[in-house]
Amino acid sequence: MGVVEGLLALALVLSACVMCNGGSSSPFIRKVEKTVDMPLDSDVFAVPPGYNAPQQVHITQGDLVGKAVIVSWVTVDEPGSSEVHYWSENSDKKKIAEGKLVTYRFFNYSSGFIHHTTIRNLEYKTKYYYEVGLGNTTRQFWFVTPPEIGPDVPYTFGLIGDLGQSFDSNKTLSHYELNPRKGQTVLFVGDLSYADNYPNHDNIRWDSWGRFTERSVAYQPWIWTAGNHENHFAPEIGETVPFKPYTHRYHVPYKASQSTSPFWYSIKRASAHIIVLASYSAYGKYTPQYKWLEKELPKVNRTETPWLIVLMHSPWYNSYNYHYMEGETMRVMYEPWFVQYKVDVVFAGHVHAYERSERVSNVAYNIVNGLCAPVNDKSAPVYITIGDGGTLEGLATNMTEPQPKYSAFREASFGHAIFDITNRTHAHYSWHRNQDGVAVEADSLWSFNRYWHPVDDSTAHVSH
């Protein structure tokens, strides 16, 4: 072989290496520390003072379009009232919303009285105050309704997943609260309390988690996704109803989007249409979830809500050795639809680390052509794993090597993310690791809308 031929051969080898390898694995080295849950006597778990004082107060969107709010809370001494008194910032006239309460038992645990009350017919872009605990110890909170739905309405979402109640969880929530971009609503991608990690699935840890997160979720909606740690299927202790604690404590407006289950549903908020899917409910052809999504995606009006966001728990594209390819069967079922309907971004959790993909799809395979590898696809979403909230299970640190081409950026650190919609064409995305200052973006990109501005926004094309 001559010199020229040798150089050409070397160039081909190097080119092949570039094509096979992916983006960047962060050089940041997190100090290895054991992740430990906060003890039950921690300040963040404090029970509010007063007889029968409401605790674990949380809100979520209560309808399809953002003009209703579900307010939930727990009383422990007696049922008390399920009424919510509320009024707008510009009015002293209090209105009353009536609710209902539920209780449940789990092994040797009996819940408090869990109240759920929906406030309806709210005005857009308005600050409301609300009171719960009427007749006993009353507590007051507030929230701000979203702007009216429209294609160029700016709005800022926070992203948190796999939070738990460790010291790292507290850092994540504090970091999110202090972020100068000021998320207005949290999109939560599953795995809330991790109570199932305790002996007999100790549901006291559901109560402590509710008190821990109240400082945020009582003031802004968290949009809920169910994860595997919400399952609580424990036949060994006589508990055979999956998701019992979760469905009693966290209500969502699933019926507003014609869903038959609280595990999959959709909402519209500002300029976004958000679809929540269930990784742990049946999703094969002919199942209720499949039939619902098949009807839901064509309903998305991109001239009204240009940003199409999907939430799920188990990621489809994951280059960590943890939970590797667990989402594969769901991906095979639904990915062609995601490409067809030009989903902008998919957020998942489950893997306790951070990763962002390029816009890729793997839908060309059939039994004849044998093509079975992700390829760049401008009609495909970006897939982001944000399961780095701080769970006591610790970080996922083992990654597949070499880094796959579909993986743009990955790092084993705890943190949160912000998805900041500017208008119908542009949104700024940023990931913030807990170790940095609140304004530091450890990973970021401008996302270009797939319907209105489907240009190449891959890491290779746009400076990172």
Swiss-Prot record:
GO molecular function: acid phosphatase activity; manganese ion binding; metal ion binding
Main location: secreted
Membrane-spanning parts: none
Entry's cofactor comment: Binds 1 Fe cation per subunit. Binds 1 zinc ion per subunit. Can also use manganese, copper and magnesium ions.
Top EC category: hydrolase
Catalysed reaction, written as an equation: a phosphate monoester + H2O = an alcohol + phosphate
GO cellular component: extracellular space
Keywords: Disulfide bond, Glycoprotein, Hydrolase, Iron, Metal-binding, Secreted, Signal, Zinc
Localization: Secreted
Signal sequence coordinates: 1-30
Binding-site residues for substrate, renumbered to this chain: 228, 350-352
Annotated residues for binding of Fe cation: 162, 191, 194, 352
Listed cofactors: Fe cation; Zn(2+); Mn(2+); Cu(2+)
Record carries keyword Disulfide bond: yes
Family that this chain belongs to: Belongs to the metallophosphoesterase superfamily. Purple acid phosphatase family.
Subunit structure: Homodimer; disulfide-linked.
Protein name: Purple acid phosphatase
Organism listed in the record: Glycine max
